[in-house]
């Protein structure tokens, strides 16, 4: 496991994302859960983002902590997410986590898939 707490992090998450994760963890009453962000093949642009809660941190996973919650990324996904930021939005179009990814050359209209 690689844990970063300094300023130069390969991926970060916003206060809004951390606050939402914390609220969801409080609902679940399971402090062992972490937000896992991953990239899989698919979507209309070639790759898509995935978000899930996970209790495990595997060997090689990258973790970053904010507001007492952890974000976890596997090494393969981290290659596509370098320099990115996980955020959370809630509005008329619904609520969702999303990734601001500087590596994405194209994204789909909903922002859930991308290409590099």
Swiss-Prot record:
Pfam families: Fe-S_biosyn (PF01521). Binds 1 iron-sulfur cluster per subunit. It comes from the Bacteria. Iron-sulfur cluster binds at residues 44, 108, 110. One of its GO terms (cellular component) is cytosol. One of its GO terms (molecular function) is 2 iron, 2 sulfur cluster binding. Transmembrane segments: none annotated. One of its GO terms (biological process) is iron-sulfur cluster assembly. Keywords: Iron, Iron-sulfur, Metal-binding. Its cofactor is iron-sulfur cluster. Belongs to the HesB/IscA family. Required for insertion of 4Fe-4S clusters for at least IspG. NCBIfam families: iron-sulfur cluster assembly accessory protein, PRK13623.1. Homodimer. This is Iron-sulfur cluster insertion protein ErpA.
